[in-house]
């Protein structure tokens, strides 16, 4: 039973979001870590993300039946009743928001609320099923965790928070389109209007390329804005160039699904590398040098 309640929260998504939360938090901390705040923020965001995922599973249980990769989800198989899942999701959300409000700060909590509302209320309930722009809207909620981590420390939505929002929102687009390409038949069967299905894979490849270019520019802004150091800059440039190269090779491949899986896989590597580098390579306030931890 515990396993089923864990599975419905999508632990893989929670883990991925925690990496970005840590990146945002440590970037803002600049080497001076408030450990109780760190724990409250991580647990709070984890609970909010878990709540959103359970609500998403509840909302999507009809279309999940039609998709190969989701047909065995807990709610689809009836291992947890829909009513119980709603109570479970609500309790997780309340606990998460309370931790962010009282353990971090009101701004972190409100950012969590906004990300949650966009994901559950706007994306899951409507945009995912009715608009080709659903992925774009969903990307905003996906970018909330690192911003929450950052603002939990600063208590202020400054240019650093805005840059993080841009980086992670732009990253979501090629990442999500790659999934839609190698899971094309699933999305088609469930009648989900993602870009590759509605406009075609060729158009999706153009969008992927443009979004990776925009992502590359956004990643550089952390250093140019005085938030991250040169080691971060080198890694950001390297992963962006490599990712862009992979995207461009997509115009010549014979098997789009194989290419999309590789692009998706590298997207995970790219965002993890950036999260790690912004955690350890930050600009110290009032310093003339871009300093970092000594490796």
Curated annotation (Swiss-Prot):
It is found in: Cell inner membrane. Its EC number is 2.5.1.141. Pathway: Porphyrin-containing compound metabolism; heme O biosynthesis; heme O from protoheme: step 1/1. Keywords: Cell inner membrane, Cell membrane, Heme biosynthesis, Membrane, Transferase, Transmembrane, Transmembrane helix. GO terms for biological process: heme O biosynthetic process. GO terms for molecular function: protoheme IX farnesyltransferase activity. SUPFAM superfamilies: Multidrug efflux transporter AcrB transmembrane domain. Residues 28-36, 97-106, 216-227, 287-295 are periplasmic. GO terms for cellular component: plasma membrane. Residues 1-8, 56-77, 126-196, 247-267 are cytoplasmic. InterPro entries: Protohaem_IX_farnesylTrfase, UbiA_prenyltransferase, UbiA_prenylTrfase_CS, UbiA_sf. It catalyses: heme b + (2E,6E)-farnesyl diphosphate + H2O = Fe(II)-heme o + diphosphate. The keyword Amino-acid biosynthesis does not apply. It comes from the Bacteria. It is a multi-pass membrane protein. The chain crosses the membrane at residues 9-27, 37-55, 78-96, 107-125, 197-215, 228-246, 268-286. Converts heme B (protoheme IX) to heme O by substitution of the vinyl group on carbon 2 of heme B porphyrin ring with a hydroxyethyl farnesyl side group. Carbon 2 of the heme B porphyrin ring is defined according to the Fischer nomenclature. Belongs to the UbiA prenyltransferase family. Protoheme IX farnesyltransferase subfamily. This is Protoheme IX farnesyltransferase. The lineage of its organism: Bacteria, Pseudomonadati, Pseudomonadota, Gammaproteobacteria, Enterobacterales.
């Amino acid at each position: 039973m515990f396993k089923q309640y864990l599975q419905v929260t999508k632990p893989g998504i929670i883990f991925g979001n925690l990496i970005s939360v840590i990146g945002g938090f440590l970037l803002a901390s600049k080497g001076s870590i408030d450990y109780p705040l760190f724990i409250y923020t991580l647990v709070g965001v984890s609970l909010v993300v878990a709540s959103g995922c359970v609500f998403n599973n509840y909302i999507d249980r009809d279309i999940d039946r039609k998709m190969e990769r989701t047909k065995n989800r807990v709610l689809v198989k009836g291992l947890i009743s829909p009513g119980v899942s709603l109570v479970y999701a609500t309790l997780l959300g309340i606990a998460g928001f309370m931790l962010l409000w009282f353990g971090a700060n009101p701004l972190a909590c409100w950012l969590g609320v906004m990300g949650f509302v966009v994901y559950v209320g706007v994306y899951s309930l409507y945009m995912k099923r009715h608009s080709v722009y659903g992925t774009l809207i969903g990307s905003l909620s996906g970018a909330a965790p690192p911003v929450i981590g950052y603002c939990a420390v600063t208590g202020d939505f400054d240019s650093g928070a805005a840059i993080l929002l841009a980086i992670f929102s732009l990253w979501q687009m090629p990442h999500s389109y790659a999934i839609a390409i190698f899971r094309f038949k699933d999305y088609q069967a469930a009648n989900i209007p993602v870009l590759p299905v509605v406009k075609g894979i060729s158009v999706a490849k153009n969008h992927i390329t443009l979004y990776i270019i925009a992502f590359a520019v956004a990643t550089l802004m952390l250093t140019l804005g005085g938030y991250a150091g040169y080691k971060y800059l080198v890694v950001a440039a390297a992963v962006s160039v490599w990712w862009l190269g992979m995207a461009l090779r997509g115009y010549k491949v014979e098997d789009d699904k194989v290419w999309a899986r590789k692009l998706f896989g590298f997207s995970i590597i790219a965002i993890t590398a950036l999260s790690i580098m912004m955690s350890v390579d930050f600009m110290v306030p009032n310093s003339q040098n871009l300093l970092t931890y000594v490796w």
